[in-house]
Amino acid sequence: MARIAGINIPDHKHTVIALTAIFGIGKTRSQSICASTGIAENVKISELSEEQIDILRDAVAKFVVEGDLRREVTLSIKRLMDLGCYRGLRHRRGLPVRGQRTKTNARTRKGPRKPIKK
């Protein structure tokens, strides 16, 4: 298995799909990485040479991915909570942040129903 950005990339998948295993790289970004490096998208990772994998490593290293990106997201949410702004309060209470209705629905964010005690 090839190791890029601290992640084991699956060998049996095509390059475009395999790169999406890295947090912070989706399909569009992986397509742009393949285009900029000149590696075909439909080639499997196991068929790539070590030089091509090194080229991919260098291309992925230019982006904020994995641990750094997770830390960045966590810090931005924490900053909102510390500010006490509306979005921060919604994060703190575990409710939807982007204006969705909560009278019905929003069960994923709110968690399972709590029975009313009489």
From Swiss-Prot:
What protein name is recorded for this chain?
A: Small ribosomal subunit protein uS13
Task: Share an example GO biological-process annotation for this protein.
Answer: translation
Going by the UniProt record, its keywords in alphabetical order are: Ribonucleoprotein, Ribosomal protein, RNA-binding, rRNA-binding, tRNA-binding
Q: What organism, scientifically named, is this protein from? A: Erwinia tasmaniensis (strain DSM 17950 / CFBP 7177 / CIP 109463 / NCPPB 4357 / Et1/99)
Q: What does this protein do?
A: Located at the top of the head of the 30S subunit, it contacts several helices of the 16S rRNA. In the 70S ribosome it contacts the 23S rRNA (bridge B1a) and protein L5 of the 50S subunit (bridge B1b), connecting the 2 subunits; these bridges are implicated in subunit movement. Contacts the tRNAs in the A and P-sites.
**Which gene specifies this protein's sequence?**
rpsM
Q: Which residues form a coiled coil?
A: none
The family this protein is said to belong to: Belongs to the universal ribosomal protein uS13 family.
- Which GO terms fall under molecular function for this chain's record? rRNA binding; structural constituent of ribosome; tRNA binding
